[in-house]
Amino acid sequence: MENIVVNRLPAKTWYWLNVNEASFEWDSNASVELEKTIITSNAIEPVIVDIAGDNDYIEKYIDIIAEDNKEVLVYINSRADKHIAVHTNINAGNNSKVKLVLLNYTGMDALLYNEVKGECKENARVEAVEVFLGKGDVYSDFRIDLSGDKSSLKMDIGYVGRDKQTIDMNVFANHLGKKTESEINVNGTLKDAARKVFKGTIDFKRGASDSVGNEQENVLLLGDDIVNKTIPLILCAEENVVGNHGATIGELDDDTLFYFESRGIEKEAAENILARASIERLTRLIDDTKIVDDIEKELEEVL
């Protein structure tokens, strides 16, 4: 067994917060590597990649290549009953668009590591939707280099954490080109004794003038033993840029609870309605009806 370190912050903060990085145990000797998948913009239909297996440790590598002036839509459906590591690389050419939907389902005592890294050339765009549902631990590491002028990233994340589950997320928008844009939206619910870490970094490198980055997280807390850590980070080496971050974290307030109760909806049902909303808002960004149905079924089990 070896200790795999992931989700590193680009600029370290106080060590006692225990958020500079994350780690998990992995048995490389027992790991089975699945056949690599290469997806290009020549695909006429959306591409669905299903990842699962019976082995104790599984790794999967995926390349997504959008050529100049092309678009590609990819769904990555990862179902972990034991240990799965998925590594996705994105290459978005000039004026291209990549839409990526990441579905993370984990069974009890399972572990899923989802790593995405990529580069956007001039006027390229990556739109990503990531959904976290299940019972096991999930580590997600997402980094896009906005190298080309006017390139952009939009990231929407929804999660429900429960029992003693760990959800550790790291999103890094690396602004390199001029007039680049990033938008990171995270909405989630924590129940029972779930543990969640979200690290969102917007880094304006020298030369990224006239660029804009925004990140926002909303967290609903529905348990007494929850551990929630939200670390928004804006780094700036360029003067003429705009970076904003915000977070709303709290329990169901009395006014909202009264609104539901006055309509005959009890507290637990009201909490579940709001928890579902953090995921269901993302289904409006997903065109595949079967994928949406699968999400709804998972929600029924979780809530």
Where are the model-predicted features located?
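Extended amphipathic alpha-helical segments enriched in small hydrophobics
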Residues: Y259-G264, A269-R281
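Long, low-complexity, mixed-charge
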Residues: M1-I44
